[in-house]
């Protein structure tokens, strides 16, 4: 692993990171009650050009402005009274694979806080000032929407949880936002992904018996996993009529707090048709991969994506609240010596990365013989613990690994 860049993002702990699925944007969450947004650009990948200040409004791709290493483009503050614990970018409307390139899809960010609220942030549609035609902006969204010239504004504050929010995550289409809390509940909020004007609570899930640490959506399905201090993972999906959410599986193989879990993307090189896989990490020092066979098809609600690479039964013969049977497929080689706080599963390479309180980052790759260690980065944040690790892509589509730690730094790694 090679350290490409280190950002001194905050003066206090970095709790969470989120990269936008299609734009070169990175968001951070910190104990300092703020979130920052950075552009995922690296000058090492471009030639030098004339020096000038970035124009405003945003410049099109043909601009001769020099590229900077991961410039900060927004500082979101004065909203939360306590730590911002989690951030999550809203995916494009309809999902990454069904994005309409003919509409302007503005980015939005959800931030969950220890003050028990969620804030929603976004940018306004560029004004028609005759500088650029809207068609030009739509055609070059990657440049315009990730520009420092955009002002990020508070769009909504969501209330409902009784205690600290530990995680937030959007579903694949941006229609649903999930949140979890120390109050032992998981909430699902529904909104119009185009306007984000209202957020209606459509489910309060109370299956966990202790603090819920993390929630994560499947990349292409309305399938939600929650991880808890009660040592279990719960899996939820919609009933056939889309009005109810049910717990359809419980994974109880860990012997300590489950801090984080992530679904495998159907795009992963090792993904198999008819099998859903999930990786989880825990206080018990283990990272485990779980698998569930979709023998009777999958009822993921009206938004269920039906990719050509997957086989699903017609909705007319699917069963409501069909139980998912999860089996432990493998335990990754144990490297960590203290609690593992975060795990990320790359949709491009299929690699899994883990990080935690021992300061290590471990990267695993799957072979025909099973999972093996590819990289170990000791003291990735010096003597500090690592709270989050994610896979992301730079603006030139290079995949990187990004970590956030107690030192307030965000480190970008080439793997």
From Swiss-Prot:
WD repeats lie at residues 9-48, 79-131, 160-200, 207-246, 253-300, 335-374, 380-415. Coiled coil: none annotated. InterPro entries: CIAO1/Cia1, G-protein_beta_WD-40_rep, WD40/YVTN_repeat-like_dom_sf, WD40_repeat_CS, WD40_repeat_dom_sf, WD40_rpt. One of its GO terms (biological process) is iron-sulfur cluster assembly. Keywords: Cytoplasm, Nucleus, Repeat, WD repeat. SMART domains: WD40. CDD domains: WD40. Pfam families: WD40. Residues 54-63 have a biased composition (Pro residues). Its main location: cytoplasm. The keyword Lipoprotein does not apply. It is found in: Cytoplasm; Nucleus. GO terms for cellular component: cytosolic [4Fe-4S] assembly targeting complex; nucleus. Residues 45-70 are annotated as: Disordered. It comes from the Eukaryota. Belongs to the WD repeat CIA1 family. PANTHER family: CYTOSOLIC IRON-SULFUR PROTEIN ASSEMBLY PROTEIN CIAO1-RELATED, WD40 PROTEIN CIAO1. Essential component of the cytosolic iron-sulfur (Fe/S) protein assembly machinery. Required for the maturation of extramitochondrial Fe/S proteins. HAMAP family: ciao1. Interacts with NAR1. This is Probable cytosolic iron-sulfur protein assembly protein 1. It comes from Lodderomyces elongisporus (strain ATCC 11503 / CBS 2605 / JCM 1781 / NBRC 1676 / NRRL YB-4239). The gene is CIA1.
């Amino acid at each position: 692993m090679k350290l490409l860049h280190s950002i001194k993002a905050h003066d206090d702990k970095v709790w969470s990171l989120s990269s936008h699925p299609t734009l070169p944007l990175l968001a951070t969450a910190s104990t300092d009650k703020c979130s920052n947004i950075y552009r995922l650009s690296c000058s090492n990948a471009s030639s030098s050009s004339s020096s000038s200040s970035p124009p405003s409004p945003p410049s099109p791709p043909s601009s001769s402005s020099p590229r900077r290493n991961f410039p900060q483009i927004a500082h979101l503050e004065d909203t939360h009274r306590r730590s911002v614990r989690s951030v999550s970018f809203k995916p494009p409307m309809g999902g990454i694979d069904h994005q309409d390139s003919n509409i302007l899809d503005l980015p939005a960010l959800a931030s969950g806080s220890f003050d028990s609220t969620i804030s929603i942030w976004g940018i306004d549609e560029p004004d028609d000032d005759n500088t650029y035609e809207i068609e030009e902006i739509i055609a070059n969204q990657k440049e315009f929407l990730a520009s420092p010239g955009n002002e990020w504004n508070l769009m909504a504050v969501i209330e409902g949880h009784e205690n600290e929010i530990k995680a937030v995550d959007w579903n694949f289409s941006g229609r649903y936002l999930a949140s979890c809390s120390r109050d032992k509940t998981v909430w699902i909020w529904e909104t119009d992904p185009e306007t984000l004007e209202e957020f209606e609570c459509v489910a309060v899930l109370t299956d966990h018996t202790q603090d819920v640490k993390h929630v994560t959506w499947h990349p292409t399905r309305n399938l939600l996993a929650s991880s808890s201090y009660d040592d279990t993972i719960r899996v939820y999906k919609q009933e056939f009529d889309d009005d109810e959410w049910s717990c359809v599986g419980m994974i109880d193989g860990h012997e300590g707090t489950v801090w984080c879990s992530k679904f495998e993307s159907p795009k992963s090189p090792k993904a198999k048709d008819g099998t859903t896989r999930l990786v989880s990490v825990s206080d018990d020092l283990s990272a485990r991969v779980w698998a569930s066979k979709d023998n009777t098809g999958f009822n993921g609600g009206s938004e269920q994506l039906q990719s050509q690479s997957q086989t699903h039964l017609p909705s007319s013969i699917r069963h409501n609240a069909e139980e998912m049977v999860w089996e432990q497929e493998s335990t990754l080689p144990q490297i960590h010596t203290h609690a593992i706080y975060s795990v990320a599963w790359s949709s491009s390479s299929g690699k899994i990365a883990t990080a935690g309180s021992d300061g290590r980052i471990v990267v695993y790759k799957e072979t025909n013989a099973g999972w093996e260690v590819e990289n170990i980065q000791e003291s990735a944040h010096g003597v500090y613990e690592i709270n989050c690790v994610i896979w992301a892509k730079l603006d030139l589509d290079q995949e990187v690994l990004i970590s956030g730690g107690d030192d307030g730094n965000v480190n970008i790694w080439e793997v």
